[in-house]
Amino acid sequence: MFQMAKRAFLSTTLTLGLLAGSALPFLPASAVYADPDTAVTNKQSFSTDVIYQVFTDRFLDGNPSNNPTGAAYDATCSNLKLYCGGDWQGLINKINDNYFSDLGVTALWISQPVENIFATINYSGVTNTAYHGYWARDFKKTNPYFGTMADFQNLITTAHAKGIKIVIDFAPNHTSPAMETDTSFAENGRLYDNGTLVGGYTNDTNGYFHHNGGSDFSSLENGIYKNLYDLADFNHNNATIDKYFKDAIKLWLDMGVDGIRVDAVKHMPLGWQKSWMSSIYAHKPVFTFGEWFLGSAASDADNTDFANKSGMSLLDFRFNSAVRNVFRDNTSNMYALDSMINSTATDYNQVNDQVTFIDNHDMDRFKTSAVNNRRLEQALAFTLTSRGVPAIYYGTEQYLTGNGDPDNRAKMPSFSKSTTAFNVISKLAPLRKSNPAIAYGSTQQRWINNDVYVYERKFGKSVAVVAVNRNLSTSASITGLSTSLPTGSYTDVLGGVLNGNNITSTNGSINNFTLAAGATAVWQYTTAETTPTIGHVGPVMGKPGNVVTIDGRGFGSTKGTVYFGTTAVTGAAITSWEDTQIKVTIPSVAAGNYAVKVAASGVNSNAYNNFTILTGDQVTVRFVVNNASTTLGQNLYLTGNVAELGNWSTGSTAIGPAFNQVIHQYPTWYYDVSVPAGKQLEFKFFKKNGSTITWESGSNHTFTTPASGTATVTVNWQ
């Protein structure tokens, strides 16, 4: 009862403090927020977090004794292809001096922590090293230049004590550069298991790697089953590789990491990744997001399909592209920004789980000499108040510049806490914990022209309204603005840092005002919810018996009922119930997609749709069909007797279109699928051209899946 009263007091205090312009919300997160949905212990949701992406080697050298020696190291960090000395002790030092807490970030996404190759590689006369962490050799050991296992554990413990989560980069797509015909090149892509050699790229008699040449990125299949540049590409249909990565990630989960960023998900089979995610969620579920690089593409159906079916979220490149076009490059306007918000909300089942960003290590930094600081500050404000989980690339708060690799990965230039960008982040980041409209809310455009965008975030009764004028020379007269803000006066949360103003609302109607040139303002209102309202369910996928976390507001302190579709879960199957968070065991129901609801004190919540219940433990099976000739316009698909195979549907839940170019060639087709372990499957292939379906004849094919590992089943078209 004391805890509930304490939370109610904090909620009221925070609301009044924000309206009065108080500095209270800008205390370190760990000092203020106690609700379980906002706590550092909530590994299943990052909705209330702001991520800070740091290249470990480029941030701070906290322990010079672990630096490389010889040609791999440049103490001046003037050669950005070499190691510069940054390590986990450097991160620990900045955690302890409150740099991150004062900035307002509550999660650190660090470079892949695993052991990388020690060899240097000469490309076109330039020495290259594995400073970036993406040239792994042993996924069960640490990169000694970052620190020891004890150092890594200390990093996690120190971060958690400050209310900061740790996200690791993880790259199960490949090891390191290799040449089939030259075992002396680099380390020949060799993979180790805690120091024991598993195998190398040359003479790969066990089939641990693909040997199909380099990808030309001409198709999804080409990118999956051919090498990414010269990197030794894993064959995930190999049972040894499958087990290796399911075991390796558990090692890091057991150390206490809070999240995973998966590299190059576009270049690995969806089926294997879904199976891998299922094993993670059955072990220790954490928020996981992948990198599906889109470049400047507006959208990609395969990208959307992956986000909705793999069990993980994605880095939101559509958001990134739109923000850069509008605020950085001036190639688009606010209507395009609003269109992106609307289209992604339609396409992604869980749009609030996608990770938003304005730049990262694989693209030119947002800031250049030609980009006004105010445009960067506005892009940050938009990202921090928009739907999705915001990620800030290290040095952005210091206006770090750099076009392309390696200049976009320069050494952290300073740790100033007085820049305007730092100030913007520090004022807006805490809103994700204090106002559920920012963490969980919907988005609605309220006023717009080419240069001005006013949008509203709303969750239950909580509201945030954001106004941005990207025109740096002309103010805008805002008239007829209608919002959900209750009657009252509202101060700019930014305190005028970006020339924002205060406003007055009369039943949601805002008095006419002038939005200054280059201005951004944020106004917000929070109040306690009296009815159950779901903001997030995580993970988004699981098997019966797994525990999932439901976050939101207004659940009350007395256990109610959780519904998966029409199946009610009560009693001991609900392992905890608090006003902002519920933990519940997935019931034994038929596999498929379900709407999750909460009933508290006789009142039903909103529905949280598209939660995926799996049949059970998952394995990856490669389905191969021979002699399936098609006509122009036809593609081949697979369906079968379990939800993971589409439950005999020929619609969007069917598997495919199948591939026929790399592992097997037309008229043989194949596809890797995550299916239930130890299960007798019945399945058929079918040809599809638009709405025209051509089924195989004869009886259903049958196959019993293994209890673990991987398998291949090959049939003839009948």
Curated annotation (Swiss-Prot):
Residues 173-236 are annotated as: B. Ca(2+) 1 binds at residues 61, 63, 66-67, 85, 87. Ca(2+) 2 binds at residues 173, 224, 233, 267. Disulfide bonds join 77-84. One of its GO terms (molecular function) is alpha-amylase activity. Residues 529-614 are annotated as: D. Substrate binds at residues 134-135, 174, 227-230, 261, 266-267, 361, 405, 409. Residues 1-34 form the signal peptide. Residues 35-172 are annotated as: A1. GO terms for cellular component: extracellular region. The keyword Nucleotidyltransferase does not apply. CDD domains: AmyAc_AmyMalt_CGTase_like, IPT_CGTD. Residues 441-528 are annotated as: C. This is Cyclomaltodextrin glucanotransferase. It comes from Niallia circulans (Bacillus circulans).
